[in-house]
Amino acid sequence: MHLTDYLTRLPKADLHCHLIGTVRAGTFADLARRAGLDLPAPPETIWRDINSLPPDPALYRHTRIPVPSGAGTDEPEVSYSLFRASEWVMAALGGADDITRITYEAFEDAHRSATRHVELHIDDVPPQLASLGFHGLVDACVDGIKLAERDFGMTGRLIASIDRSRDAEEALAFVRKVADRPNDYLAGIGLVNLELAGPPERFADAYRLAGAAGLRRTAHSSEHAPVAENTRTCLDLLGCDRIDHGYYVLEDDALVARCRDEGVPFTVISTTSRRSWRPWRRASIGAMAAAGLNVILASDDPGMFPTSLAGEYRIAAETIGLSAARLREMSLAGIEAAWLPPAEKAAARARFAREIAALDAEFPPG
């Protein structure tokens, strides 16, 4: 068996995946046409040309791993940012059936990567679906997950995402709404959007409430802000169980050592809508792995980049240089860091062990 086949079939958990970012170009085209969206280009062209422009290069002048300041080699003539594309998807959603559809399709696509468990970040309900409400949105997502459980034998959970461009009171109100109606499929909260738009300490009260309500906690950190301190804040003040991204933790040796010793899970993605940053991302992930950090590959916005979790594993092997043995460890680490109750996690752990043993019988470990 070729290594590519091995990595495609390796069982995986995707712990960092945004529902809106999973939407297929064809699905967006359907939704946009029905909604009558006034778009600057055909939906398929927009998806092909998603390319977010990096922030001010001066912010990254002194980072340990150099951040590219010029254009990438594959940038389109006209670029559409990931965030603008996400806004168009949100505006095109017409009701609960659309949400169930995109959730199911997210799992269907993940299944092709041998992904056995997915945790989806979801945003608050868009204005045109105010009558559905946040909990109606959650129910529609759960309907999609249950269909995927039936059809693909997968498991899934949801992460309610706080938009860090909002103020502290809005975040607190959102978490109250999340906590007011517990749902077994809604496992925790996250902190998303451009890191420079909102420091983690702004959301301390919201995270404290989430913890008191028994919700798990993660946050995008040390991704756009070239500092490790945000990750320390997420761990110590926000009480995060995991860190999403975390590349700039490499700026602080003491924090790297602490995270290594504590086994803090970092969900990392080598592909990004900032095409010029992809080499830097891959170098950072390689350095994090070399430092002994608990890095777990994820897909982030696979429909829009585009990528897949199997593709991320192949990049890790072929471009970053991680061994099959290390990627097996990441596969298992993913299920250990999943927000599943003990019985479900034990079942998933046993399934991963069985599937990996069967693969290793075909492909000698290396």
Q: Which residues make up each language-model segment?
A:
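Metal-cofactor-binding active-site regions of metalloenzymes
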Residues: 1-215, 223-242, 248-366
